[in-house]
């Protein structure tokens, strides 16, 4: 189990959730064998990519707002934190010899303390998963992909009242534009940031259901 955690670089919060949900989990032998084959394939692909050196150019700039920051999915108190950013460290690189340029921006302030050493550690993880997902992406028209990272310490929490409607303080950690030519996403919590980034990248690279033909799918379901 620890080896699996190390491979996917999961933090303690995610590990606890996995332990909770997979405890006593049962599935048939055929499904287990199929899953094992898939996991082995993914492991070997990640292992091969992990040995690749990524080249990037670093620039440091002052804070400049961006459209995605106005999203209602970002809590107001975290927006205030982001707007107090002192420096933005931007790493520019290309993946798999593609025409897509990747911009990874770390927002550094008293609310988001990310040292250069930490940035480089995170950068390697991010580029590894992007390079892996690029092997499967269906969106060939994406020109640029910009990832904004603000490591707020504010965690998600459940409302005190069971009848309250869940909002951005309870369930959201990121926002993204799905299948856009100018791809963009923002990760604004330190909590489970890497797991959430993988999820958002699947939206950005059209690896989700957004490109499905729902009319055809509905027709097949009614047959």
Question: Over which residues does each language-model region extend?
Answer:
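Auxiliary, metal-adjacent structural segments of Zn-dependent hydrolase domains
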Residues: 66-181, 190
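Extended, charge-rich low-complexity interaction segments
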Residues: 185, 189-196, 218
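Compositionally biased low-complexity segments enriched in polar/charged residues
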Residues: 1-5, 12-13, 98, 223
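Eukaryotic basic, amphipathic alpha-helical target segments in cytosolic regions
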Residues: 134-137, 205, 209
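Post-HExxH zinc-binding segment in Zn-dependent metallohydrolases
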Residues: 209-223
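Long, contiguous juxta-domain segments that are non-catalytic but functionally important
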Residues: 6-95
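Active-site recognition of the HExxH zinc-binding catalytic motif
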Residues: 195-208
